[in-house]
Structure formats: structure tokens, C-alpha cells
């Protein structure tokens, strides 16, 4: 996969570094990292100011190698004519880095009260950073855990408050470009969390415009919610990539779609391209059926068979006369969009569609038919599912699913074993939406463990968890994609992919996760194409899918 971004956890990176460090190459590794960091800053300065000479660069310097990288880079930038300032935040400082920056024309100050440099008040350091062209966040690296503390934490808080509501990278802005050194300080390196965050805020982290990371991307640069603080990610090769092993997180890029998207040949007939069965929509929500059908038809599936109430069937046929209404042989199912059994009494007309969902899901599992289970289907799942069943909840739906599963485990220990995860933060011990949004990877993994299914957790960064530790994190759509019905279109697109590659999906338990990531990528890019830079509707996203796919395949 040519464009794929691979994320490796802190332990993997340290293990890959170890042979080089043992061989005495620590100084060379740091020089490569600092050189790559300085080069990235030079590019930012040229783009913003047209030159490096005279530009102001402030480095927030912590302890250890992260601070050393920052100090060496500041020395290199000073040698290029930049007005470099190193702000030390701790008594401990990387000795070789400090020596290098002192040999240059860079100025060194401290806010930690030590005698290593000129002492300045915290407010002075914040003012210098706020007035700079570039700020380097070199406070914490991959060996740190938790929020930034002490003087560094106060710097992050105060500077972050000044910058939080501003557009830092707009053309002509006088505000600094924040460049994170390896990772934004204070994020959860391996799980993408924001320690200490309340209500989704990024108060304990200085959000970066660019993160220059060394050797390989780290999970926090790809996973939500921390990915929102990383900005654009640049990977600097420092020489240990071959020793990294299996990635912890994968992000597919547009160049990867062609290797996974099913393309028909001259002799391919409609049945070979896949037949998707669709159980979606109700009399109250016929639009969900139309949107899911649109996603599937426009993603190129060979045929769609629709099962549902007459009013929804008529709406589907009006939009897509090629859809066949009625049961029949299918290669995959897409079920549940627009159906909410938790809100419908048994006497409601919706009950017939709910029972249809139950029957189809049982049939799919019994006969090894790949299935997308969305919305209403999530409340009807059996105890265990194969990985070729893909669940597609948003955060609220995943919270409800997990709450129900964990309560069942506590009330039926004889069936599931004693113990298990602790209760949630809700007043009744339920898992809350806020918990899922704060730790998406954790809860998506738990859902996979509890059900056996592949889990696609929808969000600004969509997280996919599959068997054998497979994790994908896709951030392809604009914020405008958060609109009614967009998830129904995604259900149809993914259903089309599963139908087109059904035999392979059943044979290879990891393929469903890869196809789910591809569906999220195409769905997000279709939203961009539907109306670049502006609002979109779900139907417009579906309409943009064919051209989006064509562009990705050529």
C-alpha cells in the first residue's frame, strides 16, 4: 500500500532505537531528528514570511531527548539567521543540546528558577512565544505520561488560551505556527487520549499546526481525540524504520484505495459484482432506506435487493429504479439504518421491520454472509458474531451497546465469566457518550472483544477495530459531513464493498476491517467533492461517490 501511514507505539519505537543506541549512535539519531525538525521549520518560515533570516522561533524546552532535539534544531535555525529563543522549563536539560544552542547566536532563558540561564517571568515567556513566527513544543516526548506539569504546564495553558480561538495558519496571520516536536506534549501516546481533558477540551495540550515526528508516526497522531491536536504530520526518517514490526494503527491514504476497491473486468456480470440485501428504513424514516440504497448503488454494487415497508420501497424505487424489491440470494447484507427498536412499541408498524432485521441477521450469521449492522440492528445482536459482521455505531450508539453488554455480563456471570470492565460514568452505571468520545479506541476494542464483530466507530476520525489487533483511523471527511443521513450512505458504501468481495471477506477475517476503512475514506472524500469547503447533504455525498471512486482508481 503505497500511501499508507503506519503508527507505532512507544514500546515499538524504543525497541527499534535500542540497537542504534547500543552501537553508540544516540548523537547521530538526535542530529538527524533535529535536522529534520529544523528543515520543517524552514519550510514553514519560507511559506509564511518568504525567508528564514530575521524570523522569530521560540522553543519550549523540556527534559530528556525531546528537549535535546528542540535545542539542536534551534541552534541550526540560529545558524540560518533566525532569531532563536530557547525557553527552559526545568532544571534538568539535555546537556549536549544546551551546549549546541549556546554555541549559536540563540538566546537562552529559563522560567524554572535555575541558574542555567537568564531568569524571565512566565508572562514574559508567553509573550515572546505569542509574538514569534514559530513556536516549537519540545516539552514532552514519547516517554512521558500524563499532562504537562510545572512551569511547562503553565506555559501550555497560558499560550493555549491566547491561541485557542484564533486561526493560526491563515495567510498573513501574525500568530505563531505551532510545531510539535515528535508529539504534542501531554497527549496519550499509544491510545490517542487527552489526559485531564474535560468535555472534549484540549486545555492541557498546545494544539499544533504541524507535528514533526521521528522515525514513524505515533498512534496519538492518528487516533482521536489527540489527532485533532497534531495538525499536519510530517515523518522524519532517522534510520530505524525496518525494525519497527507490525503497526499499531494504520491510516489508509487515497493511493491505497485502488489495491482494495473491486474493479470489474470485461467478463464480469452483475452477480459477480455482488448483490447486496438491504433492510433499512421504516414508514417513519423512509429516507434512511433511500440513502443507504444510494450509497450502495453509486458505489458500484451489481444489484441491491430491498426489504422493507411499502412506503420506503416506493421511495427507494423512485430514487433508484434499478433496485429490486423483494427477497432473494445476496452476497452481503446492510441492515438497521433508520430503524430504532428501542423507541417502538410492539404494536407499531415498525415492529415488522424489526422482526425482519432479526431474521436476516440470524440468517446471515448461520450462512456466513458478510453484514453491515447499523443503528437499529445494534440492539438485536446475538451474543457472538464473526468478524465479517461490521458494526457501524456513532459514539452514543456504542455507549448504549456497551452498557447493555456489560450489564448482561454482570447479571449472567455463568454465561460470560465473572469480572469485566468497571461500570460507566452514567448515574446508573451506564457507559456514556462522553466516555466513548474521550477514549474511542478503548471502547471500540471492548465492543470488538465483547461481540467478536469488526467495529467501525464513526466520528471526525473514524476508528475501525478488527481481529488480530487490526486498527484503522481515518480522518478523510470535512466537519460538514456531520449531517443527518450521512451514516446511512456509509452503510450502503460499505455494504457494496462487502458484497463485491464476499468470499474473500469470509476467508480472511482481517479484510472486513480494511474494507471498512476504505469505505470511510471514500465516504469522507465524497463529502469534500460534493461541495468543497461548504455544507453538504447526505444525498449529495452519495451522488459524489462515483466520481470520487473514479478519481481514486486512476
Model-derived segments and spans:
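Short, small-residue alpha-helix embedded
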Residues: 403, 483-522
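Glycine-rich phosphate/dinucleotide-binding loop and adjoining beta-alpha-beta core of small-molecule
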Residues: 2-8, 46-245, 303-476
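Radical SAM [4Fe-4S] cluster-binding motif and immediate context
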Residues: 265-327
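Positively charged, low-complexity intrinsically disordered leader regions
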Residues: 1-53, 227-267
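Short glycine/threonine-rich catalytic loop with a Thr-x-Gly-x-Asp
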Residues: 29-30, 66, 225-228, 265-273, ...
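Glycine/charged-rich beta-loop-alpha catalytic/anionic-binding loops adjacent to active sites
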Residues: 16-23, 55-57, 138-139, 272-278, ...
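Generic hydrophobic/aromatic pocket-lining and core-packing "Φ" positions
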Residues: 34, 71-74, 289-293, 361
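Charged C-terminal helix
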Residues: 319, 524-554
Amino acid at each position: 500500500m503505497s500511501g499508507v501511514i503506519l503508527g507505532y507505539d512507544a514500546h515499538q519505537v524504543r525497541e527499534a532505537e535500542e540497537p542504534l543506541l547500543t552501537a553508540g549512535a544516540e548523537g547521530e539519531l538526535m542530529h538527524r531528528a533535529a535536522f529534520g525538525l529544523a528543515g520543517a521549520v524552514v519550510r514553514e518560515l519560507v511559506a509564511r514570511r518568504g525567508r528564514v533570516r530575521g524570523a522569530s522561533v521560540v522553543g519550549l524546552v523540556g527534559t530528556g531527548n525531546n528537549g535535546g532535539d528542540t535545542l539542536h534544531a534551534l541552534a541550526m535555525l540560529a545558524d540560518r539567521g533566525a532569531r532563536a529563543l530557547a525557553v527552559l522549563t526545568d532544571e534538568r536539560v539535555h546537556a549536549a543540546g544546551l551546549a549546541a544552542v549556546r554555541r549559536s547566536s540563540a538566546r537562552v532563558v529559563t522560567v524554572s528558577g535555575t541558574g542555567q540561564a537568564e531568569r524571565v517571568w512566565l508572562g514574559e515567556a508567553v509573550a515572546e512565544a505569542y509574538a514569534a513566527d514559530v513556536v516549537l513544543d519540545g516539552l514532552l516526548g514519547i516517554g512521558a505520561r500524563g499532562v504537562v506539569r510545572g512551569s511547562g504546564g503553565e506555559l501550555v495553558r497560558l499560550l493555549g488560551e491566547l491561541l485557542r480561538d484564533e486561526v493560526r495558519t491563515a495567510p498573513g496571520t501574525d500568530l505563531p505556527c505551532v510545531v510539535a516536536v515528535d508529539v504534542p506534549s501531554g497527549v496519550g501516546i499509544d491510545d490517542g487520549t487527552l489526559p485531564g481533558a474535560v468535555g472534549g477540551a484540549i486545555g492541557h495540550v498546545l494544539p499544533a499546526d504541524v507535528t514533526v515526528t521521528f522515525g514513524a508516526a505515533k498512534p496519538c497522531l492518528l487516533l482521536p481525540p489527540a489527532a485533532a491536536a497534531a495538525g499536519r504530520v510530517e515523518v522524519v526518517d532517522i534510520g530505524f524504520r525496518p525494525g519497527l514490526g507490525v503497526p499499531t494503527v494504520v491510516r489508509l491514504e487515497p493511493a491505497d484505495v485502488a489495491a482494495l476497491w473491486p474493479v470489474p473486468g470485461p467478463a464480469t456480470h452483475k452477480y459477480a459484482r455482488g448483490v447486496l440485501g438491504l433492510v433499512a428504513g421504516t414508514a417513519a424514516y423512509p429516507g434512511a432506506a433511500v440513502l443507504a440504497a444510494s450509497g450502495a448503488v453509486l458505489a458500484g454494487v451489481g444489484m441491491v435487493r430491498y426489504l422493507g415497508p411499502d412506503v420506503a420501497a416506493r421511495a427507494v424505487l423512485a430514487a433508484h429504479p434499478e433496485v429490486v424489491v423483494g427477497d432473494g440470494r445476496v452476497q452481503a447484507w446492510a441492515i438497521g439504518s433508520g430503524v430504532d427498536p428501542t423507541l417502538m412499541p410492539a404494536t407499531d408498524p415498525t415492529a415488522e421491520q424489526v422482526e425482519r432485521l432479526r431474521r436476516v441477521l440470524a440468517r446471515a450469521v448461520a450462512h456466513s454472509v458478510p453484514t453491515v449492522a447499523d443503528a437499529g440492528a445494534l440492539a438485536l445482536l446475538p451474543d457472538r458474531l464473526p468478524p465479517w459482521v461490521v458494526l457501524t455505531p456513532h459514539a452514543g450508539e456504542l455507549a448504549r451497546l456497551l452498557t447493555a453488554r456489560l450489564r448482561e455480563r454482570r447479571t449472567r456471570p455463568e454465561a460470560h465469566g465473572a469480572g469485566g470492565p468497571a461500570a460507566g460514568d452514567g448515574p446508573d452505571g451506564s457507559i456514556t457518550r462522553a466516555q466513548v468520545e474521550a477514549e474511542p479506541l478503548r471502547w471500540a476494542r471492548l465492543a470488538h472483544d465483547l461481540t467478536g464483530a469488526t467495529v467501525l466507530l464513526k466520528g471526525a476520525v473514524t476508528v475501525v477495530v478488527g481481529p488480530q489487533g487490526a486498527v484503522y483511523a481515518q480522518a478523510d471527511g470535512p466537519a460538514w459531513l456531520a449531517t443527518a443521513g450521512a451514516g446511512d450512505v456509509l452503510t450502503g458504501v460499505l455494504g457494496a464493498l462487502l458484497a463485491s468481495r464476499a468470499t474473500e471477506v469470509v476467508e480472511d477475517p482481517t479484510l472486513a476491517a480494511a474494507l471498512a476503512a476504505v469505505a470511510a475514506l471514500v465516504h469522507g472524500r465524497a463529502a469534500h467533492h460534493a461541495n468543497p469547503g461548504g455544507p453538504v447533504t447526505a444525498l449529495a455525498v452519495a451522488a459524489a461517490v462515483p466520481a470520487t471512486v473514479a478519481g481514486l482508481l486512476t
